[in-house]
């Protein structure tokens, strides 16, 4: 039999009061004595619940503007006291056992995220008594239940009803794990905030730290275990951030298909992040984290058809992302034409899901619509360390472009240049993208020399019978030599968009002028390693 402990006395002190009234009512109805503090106590009293203020319970007043409320032996002795071992000392000092602690902490993250938050505001939102009670109760989980998540309230009441007012050791242990995770995340936020105020170390430089803390503490929640990692001999799991603010693969709901693999998730992320770059109906097909076909059109059906034409061979077994709802006609076109691992879209119609259901192995994800891109951090693990940088949300507007060639681009060339520049951002370096009339016609990815990426893009276009003449070419970084321009000219490219910045820019521009190519500088690089 599970080691059960009855809940006879509970201390409730929460900043997030969602569901606390109903939970307290349920506890009280089951004969549980309620202790509480400050605003929580007032709220429960207003609802007619029999609640004892902690200051009345301890005989010691709340003081220092609420800084000292629960830091008292009668509270922590009641929480930490070991049943059957500390009973005599507890009785000697008139300490009653507290069987449940319900606490969530001051909203530090929300406070420091507010514009204009001062250090003083941040300091006053560092909870002291709350984490102390949480850790005390979690340490003594053998006898005490610690509740830090409102999502657990209903399950706790159901278990108490099933066990004559008691909770099992398994439940208390699980709640203790959540509690330690909660306090660890809380302390990490505080450490990161204060650590970002410490001057950075840039070799011998004494420049300001920016927003990167001295010690980086990360907290991610396990969403699922994977069958294996990138390869079958590697174990893996998928962890996500808490309260993700942007539609993503982490927030997506799987509505059908086999369990997602490690590679599925990585490739789906690449496809979804690329398709977010476009306002018009768009389709992105990804294979091994590289786009192999991208197009925009008036409908996602036509966008898919055009994206597929870029490289049908690579599209086999790929990931397909849309920035509009998946409809039945598009779903039918995909299922009839190709084998696909994952389809992700903001939503899907019932008719579309009926069609994809015919292929049960196809994974269909809906992620919700995104209103904006949210700044954040990207991480790259190296042996013994972690590289951290801002997400690459950089993009240039038409007004920011610099035409450096003698010939100006036509309106269509400019549209194609901006289109393939958006795609190049998501292709592994060295990246070259050919595009014409809002679709990719050749992609050269991941080559050690830029000229070979340019040649590969031309070869792929020729293999699929796509017309390169009059197309635009995007390069994720500058051309170190003119050879990339010569390769593009040889297949008929008429416009090139690139960051610029090479010591041989003059030679590269001269090559463009020699071939009658319009050349645009963005002054922004998009390396992707």
UniProtKB/Swiss-Prot annotation:
UniProt pathway annotation: Purine metabolism; IMP biosynthesis via de novo pathway; 5-formamido-1-(5-phospho-D-ribosyl)imidazole-4-carboxamide from 5-amino-1-(5-phospho-D-ribosyl)imidazole-4-carboxamide (10-formyl THF route): step 1/1; Purine metabolism; IMP biosynthesis via de novo pathway; IMP from 5-formamido-1-(5-phospho-D-ribosyl)imidazole-4-carboxamide: step 1/1
GO molecular function terms attached to this record: IMP cyclohydrolase activity; phosphoribosylaminoimidazolecarboxamide formyltransferase activity
Pfam families recorded: AICARFT_IMPCHas, MGS
GO biological process, one term: 'de novo' IMP biosynthetic process
Catalytic activity annotation: (6R)-10-formyltetrahydrofolate + 5-amino-1-(5-phospho-beta-D-ribosyl)imidazole-4-carboxamide = 5-formamido-1-(5-phospho-D-ribosyl)imidazole-4-carboxamide + (6S)-5,6,7,8-tetrahydrofolate; IMP + H2O = 5-formamido-1-(5-phospho-D-ribosyl)imidazole-4-carboxamide
Xref: SUPFAM superfamilies: Cytidine deaminase-like (SSF53927), Methylglyoxal synthase-like (SSF52335)
Signal peptide as annotated in the record: none
Ranges for domain MGS-like: 1-148
SMART domains (UniProt xref): AICARFT_IMPCHas, MGS
Single GO cellular component term: cytosol
InterPro entries per record: AICAR_Tfase_dup_dom_sf (IPR024051), Cytidine_deaminase-like (IPR016193), MGS-like_dom (IPR011607), MGS-like_dom_sf (IPR036914), PurH-like (IPR002695)
Disulfide bond positions: none
Keywords linked to the UniProt accession: Hydrolase, Multifunctional enzyme, Purine biosynthesis, Transferase
EC number, UniProt record: 2.1.2.3, 3.5.4.10
Family as reported in the entry's similarity comment: Belongs to the PurH family.
Description of its domains: The IMP cyclohydrolase activity resides in the N-terminal region.
Name of the protein this chain belongs to: Bifunctional purine biosynthesis protein PurH
Organism expressing this protein natively: Salmonella heidelberg (strain SL476)
């Amino acid at each position: 039999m599970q080691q059960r402990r009855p809940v006879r006395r509970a201390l409730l002190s929460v900043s997030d009061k969602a569901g606390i009234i109903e939970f307290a009512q349920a506890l009280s109805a089951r004969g549980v004595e309620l202790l509480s503090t400050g605003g929580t106590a007032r709220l429960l009293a207003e609802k007619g619940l029999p609640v004892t203020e902690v200051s009345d319970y301890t005989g010691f007043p709340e003081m220092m503007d609420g800084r000292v409320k629960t830091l008292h032996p009668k509270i922590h002795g009641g929480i930490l006291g070991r049943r059957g071992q500390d009973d005599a000392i507890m009785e000697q000092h008139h300490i009653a056992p507290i069987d449940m602690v319900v606490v969530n902490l001051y909203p530090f993250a929300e406070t420091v995220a507010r514009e204009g938050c001062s250090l003083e505001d941040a300091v006053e939102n560092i909870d002291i008594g709350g984490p102390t009670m949480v850790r005390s109760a979690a340490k003594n989980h053998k006898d005490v239940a610690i509740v830090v998540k409102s999502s657990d309230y209903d399950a706790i009441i159901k278990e108490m009803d099933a066990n004559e007012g008691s909770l099992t050791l398994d439940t208390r242990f699980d709640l203790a794990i959540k509690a330690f995770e909660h306090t660890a995340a809380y302390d990490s936020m505080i450490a990161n905030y204060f650590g970002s105020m410490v001057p950075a170390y840039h070799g011998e430089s004494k420049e300001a730290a920016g927003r990167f803390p001295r010690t980086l503490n990360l907290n991610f929640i396990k969403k699922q275990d994977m069958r294996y990692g990138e390869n079958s001999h590697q174990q893996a799991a998928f962890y996500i951030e808490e309260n993700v603010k942007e539609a993503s693969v982490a927030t997506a709901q799987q509505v059908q298909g086999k369990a997602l693999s490690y590679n599925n998730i990585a490739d789906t992320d690449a496809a979804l992040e690329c398709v977010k770059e476009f306002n018009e109906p768009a389709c992105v097909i990804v294979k091994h984290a590289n786009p192999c076909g991208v197009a925009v059109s008036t409908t996602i059906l036509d966008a898919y058809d055009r994206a597929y034409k870029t490289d049908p061979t690579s599209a086999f077994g790929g990931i397909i992302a849309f920035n509009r709802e998946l409809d039945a006609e598009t779903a039918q076109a995909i299922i009839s034409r190709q084998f696909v691992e994952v389809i992700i879209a903001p939503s899907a119609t019932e008719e579309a899901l009926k069609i994809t259901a015919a292929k049960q192995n196809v994974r269909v994800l809906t992620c919700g619509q995104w209103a904006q891109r949210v700044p954040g951090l990207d991480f790259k693990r190296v042996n013994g360390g972690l590289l951290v940088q801002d997400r690459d949300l950089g993009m240039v507007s038409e007004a920011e472009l610099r035409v450096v060639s003698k010939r100006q681009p036509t309106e269509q060339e400019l549209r194609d240049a901006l289109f393939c520049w958006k795609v190049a951002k998501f292709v592994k370096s060295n990246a070259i993208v050919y595009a014409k009339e809002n679709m990719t016609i050749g992609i050269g990815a991941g080559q050690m020399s830029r000229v070979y990426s340019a040649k590969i893009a031309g070869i792929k276009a020729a293999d699929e019978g796509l017309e390169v003449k009059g197309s635009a070419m995007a390069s994720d970084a500058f051309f170190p030599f003119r050879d990339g321009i010569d390769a593009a000219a040889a297949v008929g490219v008429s416009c090139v968009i690139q960051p610029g910045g090479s010591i041989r820019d003059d030679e590269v521009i001269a090559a463009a002028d020699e071939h009658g190519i319009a050349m645009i500088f963005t002054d922004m690089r998009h390396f992707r390693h």
